[in-house]
Amino acid sequence: MYEGILNPVKTPPIPNKISPSFVGELDNCGLRYAWQISKEPGQLPLSPKVRLGTIIHRIYNLASKGEITIANFSQIWLTEVKKEEDKMSSSWLERNFVPLIKSVSEFELKRVQTLNYISRIPEKTHHHAPFNSNNSIEPEKYLSSENWKLSGQIDAIITTEHGTIIRDYKTGKVYEDSEEGEVLKNSYKNQLMLYAFLYKQERNEWPIKLEIVTSQGEVIDIPYEKSDCENLAQNSLAKLKNLAEKIDSLQEDPLRIIELGNPGDTCAWCQYRPSCPAYKDFRKKNAYPEGTNRFDLWGTFNGLKKSRAPFIVLELKIEGKLISIQDLNPILHPILDKLTENDSVGIFNAKISRNKQSYLVDLSTVLYKIT
């Protein structure tokens, strides 16, 4: 596929399983979940911060295996960064964010925080149980239900003389704002509760503790009730079954794929926005929230104008109005020289200019010709 061409959307494969890590996605949007679980490539770049978080997560897992020490941390850090940057370099959507040290302002801070966490591992496995010969850690352990429809890999299972602790590492924001102040994201709590359920399924005992470890080294306890874990598992499997039945009913009519979407302002973080008919319909009918600084536009190609080298200006017709997209670099947007009059065009992650008469672009902005 030529870079920058968006082909007609297809009905996703029917999902037959769910991971605790993706339960939140299933709750939020069935279409997004189905695309993710089928490994459909995203059409927008991942944030470089997410890429850095992936690196830190891998290092945490290596540390839980005892493969990282303070002495070899720097070399392993460089190796893991290179692995992630190599993946980014192979993607036309993300290669412009390499190297991460330049695209992530907190790169060095996160590196130091990760090193500090590694340095504390010999002292304790969690904030109540000192690490000793009676404790053992099973890193990256795969757990599954009896029917294999619910399964996933937990970051660490810590066995102590008092019982088992289920641990998950989170490198991004773990709290969300509420009327009561900051609270742990419900999707993270549900994820750990489902792992507790799977642990009971496999080993016939419940863990004594569920905990999340953040990139700052904070350990967050998650209290739970066994019945809540069981109910959550049943509800998640029921939602999976319902989604599978919906997708199956659409196989002969792909245009009905819009029924799978659950569009809203949270779509701003979705990599599948360009292809999603439900999101496009929502965006055209609803104003952006106050304070939004990224916008998605759909229109028809009207022409190109020269700007200061090497940039050019793209003109789009949108609902009868002529809109200018400034500062487009043909090297970053290779589809520009393939556009012809009245082609359908989508611009994603554009920034509005100060005079609000045109739009600007940066490394996150993506331009598509829609076929």
Describe the function of each predicted region.
Residues 299-300, 335-366:
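Flexible glycine-rich surface loops and low-complexity tracts that mediate binding to linear polymers
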Residues 133-233:
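Mg2+/Mn2+-dependent nuclease catalytic core
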Residues 20-70, 272:
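Nuclease catalytic cores
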Residues 166-168, 311-319:
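Short, acidic/hydrophobic/Gly-rich beta-strand patch recurrent on exposed beta strands
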Residues 197-287, 359-371:
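Metal-dependent nuclease catalytic regions and adjoining charged, substrate-binding loops involved
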